[in-house]
């Protein structure tokens, strides 16, 4: 939607009007379970794109799309009556791709989790290629002092 608040408010109002009309006033038997997800308006408020989703298979999607196209005039006139704008925006219905995109992302996350589990299983049974601790540590004698810290001159003095 454009950046101005009037377009945002009008888009929200159009979304409410169209959703209410589809639920209560449109009696087309081809119309399935349609959900209006968003409305985007052009900057001049002349064209509104109504995004929708349909619950069901491809046949229900096709019949609901045809029902929306046939009810477009009635919906536009009702939008004009209820919004009171000088020029009622034209309505264009477009299937919302968000559910398909979400399903694709979820599938990618499932694949990544499966790969992570596979790598974790391999890492649990893996052995080090070299020593377990490859870093050099100073040698420690029995007194708890490291051999590097001891002064060699002290060891050579007679007691």
Swiss-Prot record:
Alphabetic keyword roster: Cytoplasm, Ribosome biogenesis
Region (Disordered): 127-159
GO terms, biological process: maturation of SSU-rRNA
Main location: cytoplasm
One Gene Ontology cellular component annotation held by this UniProt entry: cytosol
TM ranges: none
A single GO molecular function term of this UniProt record: ribosomal small subunit binding
Superkingdom field: Bacteria
Compartments where located: Cytoplasm
InterPro entries according to UniProt: KH_dom-like_a/b, RbfA, RbfA_dom_sf, Ribosome-bd_factorA_CS
Quaternary context: Monomer. Binds 30S ribosomal subunits, but not 50S ribosomal subunits or 70S ribosomes.
PANTHER family xrefs: RIBOSOME-BINDING FACTOR A, CHLOROPLASTIC-RELATED
Protein family: Belongs to the RbfA family.
Entry protein name: Ribosome-binding factor A
Organism of origin: Beutenbergia cavernae (strain ATCC BAA-8 / DSM 12333 / CCUG 43141 / JCM 11478 / NBRC 16432 / NCIMB 13614 / HKI 0122)
Gene (UniProt): rbfA
């Amino acid at each position: 939607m454009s950046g101005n608040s009037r377009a945002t408010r009008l888009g929200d109002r159009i979304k409410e009007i169209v959703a209410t009309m589809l639920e209560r006033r449109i009696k087309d038997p081809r119309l399935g379970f349609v959900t209006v997800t968003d409305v985007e308006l052009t900057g001049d408020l002349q064209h509104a794109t109504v995004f929708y989703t349909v619950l069901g298979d491809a046949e229900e999607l096709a019949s609901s799309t045809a029902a929306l196209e046939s009810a477009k005039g009635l919906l536009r006139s009702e939008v004009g009556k209820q919004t009171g704008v000088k020029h009622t925006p034209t309505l264009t219905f477009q299937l919302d791709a968000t559910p398909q995109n979400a399903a694709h992302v979820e599938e990618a996350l499932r694949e990544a989790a499966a790969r992570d589990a596979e790598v974790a299983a391999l890492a649990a049974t893996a052995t080090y290629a070299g020593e377990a601790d490859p870093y050099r540590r100073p040698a420690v004698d029995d007194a708890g002092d490291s051999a590097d810290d001891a002064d060699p001159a002290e060891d050579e003095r007679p007691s």
